[in-house]
Amino acid sequence: MRIVFAGTPEFAAEHLKALLDSPYEIVAVYTQPDRPAGRGQKLMPSAVKALAVAHDIPVYQPQTLRNPEAQAELAALKPDLMVVVAYGLILPQVVLDIPRLGCINSHASLLPRWRGAAPIQRAVEAGDAESGVTVMRMEAGLDTGPMLLKVVTPISAEDTGGTLHDRLAAMGPGAVVQAIAGLADGSLQGEVQDDTLATYAHKLNKDEARIDWNRPAVELERLIRAFNPWPVCHSTLDGESVKVLAANLSTGKGTPGEILSASKDGLVVACGDGALSLTRLQLPGGKALAFSDLFNSRREKFAGGKVLGQ
């Protein structure tokens, strides 16, 4: 089977690795154009491109797949199937129709819940009990196609956006290989999604990471986990930005944002309902540290009565 793979970040690269170890022929890889990265803003290849180059697989990086030239280029590859994972470009219907068996996508949620750009973080933020990977046939709509296969994992009270991402990145590749086998032998037909159950995982916005201490502690604790490692929740103290990477639910009442107490166990801050004990922080110019380490060296900065977010 001739497969074209389309993907960009590390999550997608894990899927490409599995396909390279499978019996299927990867005839080409599509990925986003190189982007400036790092302090020097040097053009850097995507994780998928780097892997493809290492395996001598032809790489295509069109700005769009909407023009006839790019579409003809894809058609010339004569793919049986296109596997799309976190590619980042919209595939018009004419592209979806090119491969003999169509296009399939690995999506990091249990569809139809959390269609869209940030399903992993939105699942943690919402307090979902479970997440997973859905392999589906692609349609012109956003994550709306018939579902071929699902794998499920529980979301623990300690999971962050990062830990859940890594777990799903490990689960998804096997599911894709299994789905391809089912398509090849005709055993997988697909289950139509119930649109009435659909929710949308809107793209993450850095502004969302600014902590609103008027919100309930339960919501903020989930948000802090969901946005770790990116974009990372933050607030201000003494006019300086403070990144909050971990927190636990605590007790106490006060003005939202008020420091209620500080100890090696954490910095307890009042919320709109309840309180949070902040256990891992990053101050400007420093690295992320357990609050116990900051408390030893910067105790005066975290005096009771001070208010975060002002």
UniProtKB/Swiss-Prot annotation:
Keywords: Protein biosynthesis, Transferase
Family matches, as SUPFAM superfamilies: FMT C-terminal domain-like, Formyltransferase
Binding site for (6S)-5,6,7,8-tetrahydrofolate: S109, L110, L111, P112
PROSITE patterns: GART (PS00373)
EC number(s) recorded for this UniProt protein: 2.1.2.9
Superkingdom of the organism of origin: Bacteria
Reactions catalysed according to its record: L-methionyl-tRNA(fMet) + (6R)-10-formyltetrahydrofolate = N-formyl-L-methionyl-tRNA(fMet) + (6S)-5,6,7,8-tetrahydrofolate + H(+)
Disulfide bonds listed in the record: none
One GO MF term attached to the UniProt entry: methionyl-tRNA formyltransferase activity
Purpose of the protein: Attaches a formyl group to the free amino group of methionyl-tRNA(fMet). The formyl group appears to play a dual role in the initiator identity of N-formylmethionyl-tRNA by promoting its recognition by IF2 and preventing the misappropriation of this tRNA by the elongation apparatus.
Protein name per its UniProtKB record: Methionyl-tRNA formyltransferase
Originating organism: Pseudomonas entomophila (strain L48)
